[in-house]
Design a protein with these regions (language model features):
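Short hydrophobic segments within beta-strands
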Residues: 3-5, 201
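Conserved N-proximal alpha/beta basic substrate-recognition cap immediately N-terminal to
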Residues: 6-125
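Structural detector of well-ordered beta-strand residues that form the stable sheet scaffold
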Residues: 96-97, 124, 149, 185-187, ...
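Generic beta-strand structural signal
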Residues: 98, 128, 200-201
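Rossmann-like NAD(P)H-binding beta-loop-alpha module
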Residues: 122-145
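Phosphate-binding site of ATP-dependent enzymes
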Residues: 159-209
Length: 209
């Protein structure tokens, strides 16, 4: 099962890639539109979930949870309906990629930083900022140097990320973003010519881009 919030602006590329590969391997795969679907029956004794209207066209599927892998796409976190479906699959016993707590932690950059610190994973020094006083204090706590990185707490693919070269720009950019209600953090600038994205499990690299 793939939980995703499909809308007019999204072609759900990753979901379709997973579905295509499942079809090639003769594995049943169903994309569930969390904006349209609902759970019509949760049979704890049988270990099944009956999900109605999974595609907005009245399709109804019964999932046997012990044999169900549930992929969760980021759009599911945007509203309570998506979160409720995610929690229902997880609590009913489906194998989740990823769990609700894992998704919410990764969706918030400060929460992710705190998790890295707790598990002794090296990461650039980071501080939350909420007003001009906290801004200047945070800048000192992460080293007091320029340039520095300012980020919104949520966002992907570089959206909401700024490289700040001076104190004047630091205050100006923060004030501009606060006017729109943005939650912000400051992060130590690390100079590299390139970056690598990897998936690491138990010290072993499983994939990279």
């Amino acid at each position: 099962a793939i939980l995703t919030k499909i809308n007019a602006d999204s072609k759900s590329v990753v979901s379709n890639m997973i579905a295509k590969e499942c079809k090639r391997r003769n594995i049943p795969c169903h994309i569930i539109n969390t904006s349209e679907a609902w759970v019509s029956k949760n049979d704890l004794e049988k270990g099944t979930l009956l999900v109605s209207n999974i595609d907005g066209e009245d399709t109804e599927i019964e999932f046997e949870l012990s044999k169900t892998i549930c992929f969760t796409r980021a759009g599911v976190l945007e509203d309570e309906t998506g979160l409720a479906l995610l929690s229902t699959f997880e609590n009913a016993g489906a194998f989740m990629i990823n769990t609700r707590n894992g998704m919410l932690t990764c969706d918030n950059k400060m929460s992710a930083y705190i998790s890295f610190e707790r598990d002794n994973i090296p990461t650039p020094r980071t501080a939350l900022i909420s007003n001009e006083k906290s801004l200047l204090d945070a800048h000192k706590r992460i080293g007091g140097n320029y340039p520095v990185i300012m980020k919104t707490l949520t966002g992907t693919q570089g959206i909401g990320v700024s490289i700040i070269e001076s104190e004047k720009s630091l205050v100006s950019v923060a004030q501009s973003l606060w006017k729109f209600g943005a939650a912000l953090l400051l992060q130590e600038f690390m100079k590299f010519d390139f970056d690598i994205r990897t998936i690491v499990v138990d010290g072993r690299i499983l994939a990279s881009t």
